[in-house]
Amino acid sequence: LQTLIDRGYMIETLEEFEIGYSKVKDRVVIPVRDTQYKIVGLIGRAIHEWQEPRYLYNKGFKRADVLFNIQNAKRYDSVVICEGSLDAMKVSQAGYKNVVATLGAKVSANQVKMIRKFFDSVVIFSDNDDAGAEMRSAIIDECRGKELFTVAIPDGLKDPGDMTQEQIVHAIENKKTFIGDYT
């Protein structure tokens, strides 16, 4: 877990999200829960640059059926949506407990249903790349009628996981209201 601590994750955050370590796979293990707090999947995240693939999932785990941290975020009217679980953990660490992750750049119909069911306001904090732009557009298209905001990641950084707590707070406080067609 030292790798995550070195990347700015606090011990308290790792404990809050019940992060573990697999000696057998030499990976960080991240549990994923459903709205009823039941563990529905495990993510094995590579900790070394040479490890491929970067993510391993337990057999039968369907990422498209869940939003990471939905069990906690569902208590709020507003949600911050990130792509990765580590991004969501970093945003939560910055004080935004109403954060979820889609566990990939694709947003599924089931994920959209959950977003529409639980939240009135949606803050899109997608990665700073082409896939992140596609994710942002998909959420905007599927969540019309909700209050929609977008967050900009500073140039030179890829995702919220690369940001400091101060940068995350500043980015979310300066979110842009989405109005009309997104280009």
Report each predicted region and the residues it spans.
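Phosphate-handling DNA/RNA-contact segment within nucleic-acid enzymes
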Residues: Q2-F119, M135-R136
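Acidic beta-strand-to-loop metal/phosphate-binding motif
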Residues: I81, F119-A131, A152
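A short glycine-rich beta-strand->turn/loop micro-motif centered on a GG-aromatic cluster
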Residues: V99-A105, F149-K158
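Acidic, metal-coordinating catalytic cores used for nucleic-acid/nucleotide bond scission
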Residues: K106-S108, S126-S137, L157
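Alpha-helical scaffold elements adjacent to nucleotide-binding pockets in ATP/GTP-utilizing enzyme cores
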Residues: M114, A138-E142, Q167
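Conserved phosphate-handling catalytic cores of large alpha/beta enzymes
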Residues: N128, M135-R144, L148, A152
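C-terminal or mid-to-C-terminal helical accessory/interaction module adjacent to the motor/catalytic core
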Residues: T150-L157, M163-T183
